[in-house]
Amino acid sequence: MAIQLLGNDLVVNEDSCNLSCEYCLTGQSNLKQSHHQQLIFQPPKVDRYGDDSPLAQRIDAVSDRMRETFDVPLLKVTGGEIFLVKGMIDFLEREAPKYSVLVVQTNGVLVTEEHLERFRSWGNVVLQVSLDSHLHHGNSYRVPQPSLHAKVVQRIERILRSGLPVEIYAVLNDRSVVEMEDYAAWLLRFADVVSYFPFPVRGPHAEQYKIRPDQIPLVDAFVDRYDDFAPILPPRAYFARLLRFYHEGKRTFRCHVPRLVISTFSDGVVTPCPNIWFSDMGNVLDDDYEASLEKVGKTGLYQALLDPKPRLAACHGCFTPWDTLSMYFEDEITLDELCAAPTYAPEPIRKLVARLKEDWKLEEARAASRDTLAV
């Protein structure tokens, strides 16, 4: 019998984007041959979602099979840039009623007023928008041209004025860290709808972009001003973890994300972690997909990913907004603090996360008891 999960992170056409972020993780992944050294600098491919399109047949099946197997109340759809797909809004409309929350990650450039109006009408959409800074220097690893950056910010401002809940995903690098305080002050204008989640640049090429040791005090200084920016920030404990990551030079704290969220792709590939695409666990579009999904949560890789101390090199460099789930499981934040974020605010998600934590604690207690008896 399959376990219940919180969410499915569905990645659509991950190698197709309208921006060319220098630190893009797709080309740093070993999951697929198509990812190898592929930093998405080629022209994006044309694709379409519609009744007779191959993409529609695939992603409809991926979403349905994962939801039916793991009873997930949360669907996150990301890319690439998903709005490069003609008709993507129709897929999102198909999925919205099936979930407690539909999380849509985008760089915002192709989001239209029609999209925003339809999102509002569904009532359960959270937008996760990628923007490292409102100023060009801090966002220049994403958008090197100042004129294009200005257009990107203009589009994102429209999203922030839409009334929809927005989580800003901001990669901290040696350029953006200089502008954290200015950026947060700018975002405060939209405090009724926005949450600001800064997190470290990741991946095997992160060394080129990560904040320098002499810049860590800039993060310390930002955290010292937590109260000034509190209306748009995650819990204070999030920044305690972030500072620990920087001061210790790597992740040393436990991750629970793979026990809660799984990652799938529009070609059907399944991998256990939404943060780092470690391994191909099988394909949910195969006729025997149930056998592949039966392995979820039970393989040696899962044991390594969920170990009390991070064991894999890739995990040592990982810290993302998903970490608030781990923080709740580790009693670093309360359920109320976790669910203040719009992604986890719906009552069914709140109840499920609390139950999954209790189930895990009971299993941990049983395991400890077995170990004691064995001695």
Residue ranges: model-predicted function:
Residues M1-L6, G27, L31-H36, P274-V375:
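Flexible mid-to-C-terminal extensions adjoining Fe-S/redox cofactors in radical SAM and related proteins
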Residues M1-W122, P348, A367-R370:
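Conserved alpha-helical substructure of the radical SAM core
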Residues D9-V11, K76-T78, V103-N107, Q128-D132, ...:
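A cross-family glycoside hydrolase active-site/sugar-binding cleft signature
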Residues V11, D15-N18, G249, P308-L312:
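Processing junctions and N-termini across compartments
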Residues C17, C21-C24, C255, C273, ...:
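Short cysteine clusters
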Residues S29, G80, D132, F199, ...:
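Flexible loop residues that form catalytic
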Residues K32-Q38, V46-G50, S130-D132, H136-T271, ...:
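Radical SAM enzyme [4Fe-4S]-AdoMet core and its adjacent flexible, acidic
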Residues S100, V125, D192:
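Receiver (REC) domain switch/active-site residues of two-component response regulators
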